[in-house]
């Protein structure tokens, strides 16, 4: 029974729960790695050893957080749980493939951990650029294991993407039109398209790297007519859409949370929100070389990538102001989920503004590979993606479990986390402007103050993570059941109660629209 339910599961809710648990566990590992990084940088001098081990930790931190925490929770967890419920489908289109998508991740994670354990580890950064990732600078199996790990995670995501696209296009009941599809469903659909188009390019790039390392090909080796810059183009053609993949489902969740706790029946500018997400998805594919302003591109090429990158700020701004407009005139309920959503809007916007700064190719020459970039992408990921996950988690926790979290603890948790992440990452802007480079385990004494403050912030965030574990335990132990849910007419996922039965929408739903 246990094996049939959890190992051979074909139920979207159970698979979503597995993704959630796996993502939470990986998040603990990633948090531990980030604490190691900040402990090393907390004061000048060496803590862990040389830069190789430091860069192994940094690389593992990036891969764990991206491929094993944010993506499994947002797309695998929330996506699996909510998409079928929101569109009134009985399950995903391919339930067994759904299960395989999940079970490819633990072996992938195992390979990544193995890569750190053998030889000297993969100290390449998450970009895995040759020649540093080649078989001279990184002899041994570490980078090869990392490549195989990425292959498995990539296959998992591609299969998941096919599943979501098929489900969303084909499994809506006739009563739901395209324009009644909830924004979270739209966001997952667009995310799935991005995954489907970008991951094969990454697979090609890392496969060529694998053959360069092991079969003496010279795709990225000038000695045989190859070019390491080709790898950078292939990687970033995946890598830039990837960062939008990480944030788009968050946009969808924030839209639902802001609408719900503003007491509105729909978000402001529904069509504009859909257009904005589609625009971001499209533009995300044509800006990749802004990660490569320092490799010596022509001035006209740099001008194009600068302006194209700045254009993305327009649909993003549409979303931010639509969220604010959704709240306007509403009866706002200051629930923990709403606090996360407001924190998201504020901090994501700050991250977006530093992104606009970095999009200027001339400025980026100076800021590239400094802590300014680290601060920028942690504002959009550590305070964008993670805040969206937290907001979604506390909002839908009653749906997933049938129990309610303690509101007071949840608000305290938000406050600690908010202080922690800002104290960690805001000073890094100053470090970057002062020229402190990334990916070094030590630094000149002049940078000590901001690094010490940053490291203190990371320990505050750690406290918040531990408190969240306590909060979940408290909720599951107290067993406060959900009494009633408001606004179910526009929030279809709640209509079956909390938690919903194992099978939902076994016959096609008819959704009566009031307008």
Swiss-Prot record:
One of its GO terms (molecular function) is cytochrome-c oxidase activity. The keyword NADP does not apply. The keyword Mitochondrion applies. Its EC number is 7.1.1.9. Fe(II)-heme a binds at residues 61, 378. This is Cytochrome c oxidase subunit 1. Belongs to the heme-copper respiratory oxidase family. The chain crosses the membrane at residues 12-40, 51-86, 95-117, 141-170, 183-212, 228-261, 270-286, 299-327, 336-357, 371-400, 407-433, 447-478. GO terms for cellular component: mitochondrial inner membrane; respiratory chain complex IV. There is a cross-link at residues 240-244 (1'-histidyl-3'-tyrosine (His-Tyr)). Its cofactor is heme; Cu cation. Na(+) binds at residues 40, 45, 441. It is an enzyme of class 7 (translocase). It is found in: Mitochondrion inner membrane. PANTHER family: CYTOCHROME C OXIDASE SUBUNIT 1. It comes from Heterogeomys cherriei (Cherrie's pocket gopher). It catalyses: 4 Fe(II)-[cytochrome c] + O2 + 8 H(+)(in) = 4 Fe(III)-[cytochrome c] + 2 H2O + 4 H(+)(out). Residues 1-11, 87-94, 171-182, 262-269, 328-335, 401-406, 479-515 are mitochondrial matrix. Component of the cytochrome c oxidase, the last enzyme in the mitochondrial electron transport chain which drives oxidative phosphorylation. The respiratory chain contains 3 multisubunit complexes succinate dehydrogenase (complex II, CII), ubiquinol-cytochrome c oxidoreductase (cytochrome b-c1 complex, complex III, CIII) and cytochrome c oxidase (complex IV, CIV), that cooperate to transfer electrons derived from NADH and succinate to molecular oxygen, creating an electrochemical gradient over the inner membrane that drives transmembrane transport and the ATP synthase. SUPFAM superfamilies: Cytochrome c oxidase subunit I-like (SSF81442). Keywords: Calcium, Copper, Electron transport, Heme, Iron, Magnesium, Membrane, Metal-binding, Mitochondrion, Mitochondrion inner membrane, Respiratory chain, Sodium, Translocase, Transmembrane, Transmembrane helix, Transport.
